[in-house]
Each structure stands twice: as structure tokens, then as C-alpha cells.
């Protein structure tokens, strides 16, 4: 008699749009059940994945909701942990299971940020050096340097913590969606830590927005996050930084304007302890 399988502890949640070929390459590399939330692709992604990988749970959306698709994916996961892999990223063999064990050994850890190796050359993503050298005080009950930010494609979250802070929101959307989630996790008492011993591979898709478009989006997200969470003096400082950041910052400010009412409706100022960390990171 075959013993019953233990229930899965982790699910890979992927939000994707019009990256069918990237998915067909990356999906076989995942070592956990996969939930793919498709942001209204027009390249036959849903049908292609269903044919090639019937084991994948595909959630097709009628419109592009940005990073909110990940939150939808978490609701379909049914596991205590979720890894936010992208259509062009995957965990190194065995490392997702190791990361889950780290989470289980550190009950206050709400989010684990893995090391990121980029491309077939396995170049260390510069953000990993920044996370490893985080100026925030290292907490004794966390497995690595404390953080107030992360890269979604290399993050493992405790679902209890992620859902308690509302997941990714429909104000920021994408890109730069990580900051508000990180700040709210910290405000709720959850720890975020960089763990260099586990690795995610990221082979950036060729189907990407131009860097100038992405930088504009990131500044828009910074402004909206500040509107939702920063006290007024810090908010003013972030608006000034955006105005001084050249064309991407100015365009980011302008593109944030239509979402200002929604951001203000969601406004909840962070506690002083978290804002102290924000100021340390901003220098």
C-alpha cells in the first residue's frame, strides 16, 4: 500500500502576461505545485500552458490587473507558504524546500528574500549586495539581514502574513509593488530577511518594457506608496526626490495623479519604528 502523500507546504505563484515562450521554458523547472494567473494575455498563453502542463492550475483573468494577480494566485494556492516566481525565474534545485525549512524554523519571518543569479552567466544581481549590506539592525530571531523591501520574483512569503496585510494592491499595481507590502509586513510585526544560502535564477525575458518606461513606473509606485503610508514630512521628501529625478521622476509624478484619490482612501501612516528604518535606507 502506498503511504499517503504529505500535503504540499509551498506553491509557486506566477503572474504573467504575453510571455508564453518564457513560461514554456521555466515551468518544468519548478519543484512545487504552480498556480499561473494570466493577466489577459493575447498570445495564447492559457491554451498553450494547459496543453503542455496540465498539472499547472491556470487562472485566466479578463483584464490586466498587474501585481494584484499574485494576490489572486495566493487565494488559489492552499499552502502555508507561497513563492512568487515570475515567468522568467525559478528556484535552484532543492533551494525552495530549504527556504521553506528556514521559514518554519523562524516563526516571525513573514518574507524571505533569496539570492538572485541573473542570466546563463549566473551574475549576482546588484540588489543582493544591497540586501546583504542592509543598514537595518539585524534581528536575533531572523535568519539574515533585516529588510524593508524585496524583489518579488525571488520572494517566499508566509501566507498568513501576506494576506493579513492585504497582499499586492490595486493602487500601485506594477512595477514597484513590493514596497507597500514590505512596509505593511514590518508595521504588523513580521520580519523580512535576506537569506544568501538559497538561490533564484532569473533569465530576464526579452519581452520587457523599455527601461525608461519601467523607471517611470517605479517612481509612480514610490509616490503612491508614500501617499498611502508616509507621514507628511517624509511624503514631501519623496515628492521632492521624484521631482529631482529627471524625466522618469517627473513622468512618474504625473502618472500617479489619476490614482491619488485611491491612494488617499488607503492611507494609513506607518509607525515611527518602521519610518526610522525607511529613513536609514534612504540615507
Model-derived regions: residue spans:
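Conserved donor NDP-sugar-binding/catalytic core segment of glycosyltransferases
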Residues: 93-126
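Short aromatic/hydrophobic "clamp" motif used to bind/position activated sugar donors
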Residues: 82
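Glycine-rich, basic loop-to-helix element that forms the pyrophosphate-binding segment
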Residues: 60-77, 98
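Non-catalytic, C-terminal membrane-associated alpha-helical segments of glycosyltransferases
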Residues: 216-221, 231-283
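A short, conserved alpha-helix in the catalytic core of glycosyltransferases
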Residues: 149-157, 161-166, 171-198
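Short, well-formed alpha-helical segments that are part of the catalytic scaffolds
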Residues: 13-32
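Short, flexible, basic/aromatic active-site loop/helix in glycosyltransferases
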Residues: 114, 129-147
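A conserved acidic beta->alpha catalytic loop
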Residues: 20, 29, 38-47, 63, ...
Amino acid at each position: 500500500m502506498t503511504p499517503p502523500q504529505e500535503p504540499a507546504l509551498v506553491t509557486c505563484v506566477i503572474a504573467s502576461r504575453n510571455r508564453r515562450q518564457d513560461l514554456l521554458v521555466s515551468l518544468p523547472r519548478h519543484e512545487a505545485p504552480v498556480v499561473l494567473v494570466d493577466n489577459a494575455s493575447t498570445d495564447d498563453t492559457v491554451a498553450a500552458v494547459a496543453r503542455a502542463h496540465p498539472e499547472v492550475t491556470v487562472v485566466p483573468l479578463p483584464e490586466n490587473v498587474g501585481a494584484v494577480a499574485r494576490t489572486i494566485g495566493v487565494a488559489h494556492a492552499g499552502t502555508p507558504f507561497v513563492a512568487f516566481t515570475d515567468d522568467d525565474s525559478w528556484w535552484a534545485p532543492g533551494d525552495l524546500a530549504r527556504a521553506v525549512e528556514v521559514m518554519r524554523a523562524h516563526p516571525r519571518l513573514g518574507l524571505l528574500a533569496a539570492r538572485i543569479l541573473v542570466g546563463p552567466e549566473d551574475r549576482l544581481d546588484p540588489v543582493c549586495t544591497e540586501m546583504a549590506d542592509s543598514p537595518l539592525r539585524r534581528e536575533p530571531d531572523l535568519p539574515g539581514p533585516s529588510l524593508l523591501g524585496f524583489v518579488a520574483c525571488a520572494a517566499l512569503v508566509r501566507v498568513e502574513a501576506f494576506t493579513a496585510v492585504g497582499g499586492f494592491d490595486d493602487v500601485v499595481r506594477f512595477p514597484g509593488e513590493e514596497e507597500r507590502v514590505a512596509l505593511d509586513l514590518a508595521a504588523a510585526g513580521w520580519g523580512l530577511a535576506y537569506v544568501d544560502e538559497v538561490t533564484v535564477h532569473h533569465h530576464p525575458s526579452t519581452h520587457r518594457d523599455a527601461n525608461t518606461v519601467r523607471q517611470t513606473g517605479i517612481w509612480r509606485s514610490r509616490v503612491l506608496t508614500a501617499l498611502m503610508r508616509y507621514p507628511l514630512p517624509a511624503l514631501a521628501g519623496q515628492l521632492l526626490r521624484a521631482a529631482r529625478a529627471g524625466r522618469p521622476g517627473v513622468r512618474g509624478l504625473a502618472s500617479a495623479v489619476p490614482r491619488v484619490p485611491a491612494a488617499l482612501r488607503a492611507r494609513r501612516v506607518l509607525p515611527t519604528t518602521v519610518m526610522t528604518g525607511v529613513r536609514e535606507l534612504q540615507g
